[in-house]
Amino acid sequence: MTKNNHQLLIALGSNIGLATSRPVDIIKDAIIELSKSGIILKSLSRFYETPAYPQGSDPNFVNSVVKAEANYSAHAILQKLDKIEEKFERQRNSRWSARTLDLDLLALEEQVLPSKEVFQYWCDLPLSEQKKKTPSELLLPHPRIQDRVFVLLPLLDVEPNWLHPILNKTAVQLYQKLPEQTKKNIQTMQ
């Protein structure tokens, strides 16, 4: 690790192309934009195709995870991710809607933001409430990592021993706890 840089994990997803770009191309271009923004890429997962949520509601997603380093605060990284999403015409029409690009800061070292209590509130929020509510502040680690096969499987490619700072489980352990049916719905892309 470069002096003063922080280890971070970013999830990438896309299920709507642009005029000249398919979702997989958007993910590849977004990775280039991450590098241009001062985020140093260390490793990239394979690309995975996953159903949209709820299944059948929208085109399938292309998902990936990058392990990176940066000498920025969590909030500065989030601003950079938002600018990259804007470059790819990201629209925030509704929660969990189709999108050209979704960049999520999954973790920044062992940081818990804004607090363990706030994280726990969002982590424990019932699905019916998750559909309606959106956090107004940055949450780290991302409160849904443990629930999402489209995050955990790519995460296994780049950092299988990543330890969740609150749940105290590795990425491998979190993946193993997922229902088998959800694991069947994800495909490695060629």
Role assignments for model-derived ranges:
Residues 8, 40-43, 60-64, 99-103:
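A generic structural signal for short beta-strands and their flanking turns/coil linkers
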Residues 43-70:
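Short, charge-patterned binding micro-sites
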